[in-house]
């Protein structure tokens, strides 16, 4: 199962094993490099181990009433500017105070750096959540690059514009709910007119037209 990763909104990121790798400086620098390319303006980050007490609902002994959870707390460091646009230093924001999109991007960047050349299968539910379509396009380009030739990414999305990304037709699948409320899965590759050049077809437009 270490070759299979599921990314969803239910996992508490601060206690995720991958997030702990940000304590390693070399690993952290690779993640920051990816964040900079994605234009998130993060210059550095500080990761530190913290302990959190959690109510133990199984043990009733007074002394064993709490479990100690090891977590990682992260500060993100951004460039700051004066009113003329000149850099004045950095400002620090704890990741619990940053946007959902930034935290999610940090998580995905961590997963991608860790998965490099390891032959992993990564499932990402609601891939476009909290992301502008340009960020989704950037991430899909990385997923489909030679860097990730040994990995497989399986993502779900409601973002129609992603249909026009430079993907092979056998990489695009649709889920349709039948009148029996059963989900049916079918591939874009199964359509009969795929002898046309992929670049000449807007699948997003055709999908919206119901073609």
Report residues per predicted region.
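Phosphate-coordinating catalytic segments in nucleotide- and nucleic-acid-processing enzymes
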Residues: 1-105
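Conserved D-loop-proximal element of ABC-family nucleotide-binding domains
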Residues: 129-133
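The start of beta-strands in P-loop NTPase/AAA+ ATPase cores
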Residues: 91, 120-121
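Short basic/glycine-enriched coil/helix segment immediately N-terminal to the Walker B
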Residues: 112-120
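Walker B catalytic acidic pair
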Residues: 125-127
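C-terminal lobe/lid and adjacent interdomain/linker elements of RecA-like ASCE P-loop ATPase modules
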Residues: 118, 138-211
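Hydrophobic anchor residue at the start of the ABC signature
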Residues: 108
